[in-house]
Design a protein with these regions (language model features):
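Conserved alpha-helix/loop element of class I SAM-dependent methyltransferases that forms part
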Residues: 1-8
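A short acidic, Gly/Pro-enriched loop at the edge of an enzyme's catalytic core
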Residues: 63-74
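Conserved catalytic/acceptor-binding region of the Class I
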Residues: 94-165
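Class I SAM-dependent methyltransferase SAM/SAH-binding core
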Residues: 9-13, 17-64
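A short, conserved alpha-helix within the catalytic core of class I
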Residues: 84-92
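Conserved Class I S-adenosyl-L-methionine
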Residues: 142-225
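Short catalytic micro-motifs in class I SAM-dependent methyltransferases
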Residues: 79
Length: 225
């Protein structure tokens, strides 16, 4: 499809610490990252310097980027689509894409199968945070297609694949502590209690390291007319 080739002008929405924007820059793209969090983008700049790449960062909302019409060959949203006002962001992406440009919505989710580490971790999150309702995902997101179609994107495509991701116990605990259901929801004391229970669960149920945590990559792609 020729998406993200060297020389393409690309915009990474909800860039955070710049993982996707940095990867695009490493491919030779004219890469811009956009986020509402200045501290996260400052960390992204530090990581860019270590990687030896240059990315421009813009502090703005994905719903109102401030860029002129037909500015980009590629707009990408990784791990952030459902935090946005989706119809507004899809329309904004359509506005700022060049004719023939692409919007890519990507997700990378752990997959909770009965008794695996993701399943038992989710059950522990639900125990400590009953209001958390994001568990049980199959890692397939058809709503992305509706969002694209309603905003005028055509030639919609999806793909997905599974892979095991290796984590040490410490790294898995760190990822879960930073997740929306724990670090963004529990009190500092609650996070400590949760983390101790997760540490004990891993030691009892999954003592071997590294952990092999099943994940699913899903992407939806739409073309601007």
């Amino acid at each position: 499809m020729g998406i993200g080739r060297a020389g393409a002008r690309t915009l990474d929405l909800g860039t955070g610490t710049g993982t996707i924007a940095r990867s695009l820059a490493q491919r030779g793209c004219d890469s811009i990252g956009l986020d509402r969090s200045a501290p996260l983008m400052e960390e992204a700049r530090r990581m860019d310097r270590e990687a030896g790449v240059t990315v421009r960062y813009v502090e703005a909302a994905a719903e109102d980027t401030g860029f002129p019409e037909a500015s980009f060959d590629l707009v990408i949203a990784g791990q952030c689509w459902f935090w946005f006002d989706r119809p507004r962001v899809a329309s904004e992406a359509r506005r700022i894409l060049k004719p023939g440009g692409h919007l890519v919505i990507a997700h990378f989710d752990w997959i909770p199968l009965p008794g695996n580490v993701a399943d038992l971790t989710e059950k522990l999150i639900e125990k400590h945070n009953p209001k958390w309702k994001l568990g049980g995902s199959l890692g397939i997101h058809p709503r992305c297609l509706a969002d694209m179609a309603l905003s005028g994107f055509r030639r919609l495509e999806t793909f997905s694949f599974d892979l095991d991701v290796s984590y040490s116990h410490e790294a898995w605990r760190g990822r879960i502590r930073a997740s929306a259901g724990v670090g963004a929801s529990l009190s500092p004391e609650g996070v400590i209690v949760f983390d101790r229970e997760l540490q004990a669960l891993l030691a009892e149920k999954f003592p071997q390291e590294p952990l092999a945590v099943l994940h699913r990559v899903f992407a939806a792609i739409g073309k601007a007319a």
